[in-house]
Structures are given as structure tokens and as C-alpha cells.
Amino acid sequence: MQNPKKIAVVGSGLVGTLLAIYLKKRGHTVHVYDRSPDIRKINFTGRSINLVLSDRGVKALRDVGLDQEVLGIGIPVEKRAIHTGSDTVNEQFYGKDGEVIYSLSRGLLNKKMVDLAEKAGVEFFFGEKVWDVDLTTATISIGESERGEWTTHDYDLTFGADGAFSRIRHKMQRQSMFNYSQEFLNIGYKELNIPANADGSHKLDKNSLHIWPRGNFMLMALANLDGSFTCTLFMPHDGENSF
């Protein structure tokens, strides 16, 4: 076992929370910072595409004893259901009998992971904006605005898990010989919803990932625990049949 360290994780998303649990279980003091409010106390309006959890993700959870906790809020998905037109549906199983992936609400999973991390002893600091990090000392700087007054917090290690507009990566990019590239696809998405039947049951097979492929655009649907389906329409930003 390593000597206990004081560690900061910037970002309370799925990666940040799981990393924090791993570090805490190894005996470290772990603080998680996030500029957003506590996701458990607000209506979730972030990225809403359902998350599909495969065997690799299950293993990552199993290694810290959390797989059953998380799978309890998911729906097993054993196959793709390809809706090619009319009433034709082609089924493609993901593996042998019993081999499945899991459909989970991203927001519900994130809330669960924060709960599990807190239960493990991780401390969270929500609404705290990290603007800078000293890459040599791991000291982080927090303040209300980028040009305002900052307070510093000293750590032995700081991990960046703060997403697409990461302040940690921003600081790393200013180092010599640091390569970074960013590309944008000409594909966007919109969330749609298939509500549950009046009795709360699913309108489609809940254990399938439903796909309606139509050339350069497609619709997919994954089941939720409440009987609904979260659907995602993928289309080009421009041109015919686009957003």
C-alpha cells in the first residue's frame, strides 16, 4: 500500500467519481471539486443520451465492489433490433446466452456514483470553480471568476476529469511539446422520448437497443426503468434531412 496522500480530483462526472472511489479505497484523502451544483439537488439537464455499460465498465465497478449497486439501476440489453422498414426487424445478439450490456440513464448513474463516492469517504466541493493548477506542486486555485480573486489549496496529486473544456488540460497545453487536437463532426443529435404504455409497460422490447438506420441519419432508442425509452436522433447539421 502506498503512503496516504492528499489528492484532488477536478470534475464530479462518471470518470471523476469512479477515480475518487479507487483512490479512497487505497487509503488516500480525496477531495472532488466541480464548478456545477450538486447534480443530486437539481433537475438534470445535461447530456442525456443513455449510457450503455459493457463488460469493461462492469469490471471497473466490480473491482471496487460496486457492480451490483450500479446494475440495479440499469436494464440488461441482449441484442440490437434493427428496424429496416415496414415491420421488418433484424435481431443481432451481443454474445452468448447471458452476455449482455446495460442501458442506464446518464444522470441517474452520475447521481448514484456521487452517492457511492460519499459513502466511501470522498469529500465533494460543488460550485467551486478551479481556474488554475500548478503542474509541479499540484496546487489548485479556486475563485468566482477567471479574473477575480483566487484561493489556493495544496495537494500531493491533482487529477483532471473536468471534461471537454478542462482547465487542467488548458494549463497542460501551455507546456512545451504538449500535443493537442480537437475536431468537430458534422453530425448533431436531438433527444426524443417514447412514453410508457398506460400500465407503465414498455412499447418496445426493453431488452433490445433499437436502431432505425436511414442512410445519413438514424434513430436509436434505449429503455428506461419507468417504461419509457430515451431516443436519440443523429443527423447532419447541414443539407437535406439535417438539423
Q: Regions from the language model: what does each represent?
A:
Residues 115, 131-132, 137-243:
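Conserved FAD-binding catalytic core of PHBH/FMO-like flavoproteins
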Residues 15, 38, 165:
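Conserved Rossmann-like nucleotide-cofactor binding loop
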Residues 8, 31, 123, 230-232:
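A structural signal for isolated positions on well-ordered beta-strands in alpha/beta enzyme cores
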Residues 28, 66, 122:
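Short phosphate-binding/catalytic loops that engage adenosine nucleotides
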Residues 42-116:
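Active-site-adjacent segment of FAD-dependent monooxygenases/related oxidoreductases
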Residues 24-46:
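Glycine-rich FAD pyrophosphate-binding loop
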Residues 5-32:
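N-terminal Rossmann-like FAD-binding beta1-loop-alpha1 element of flavoenzymes
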Residues 118-130:
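A conserved beta-strand/loop element that lines the FAD pocket in flavoprotein oxidoreductases
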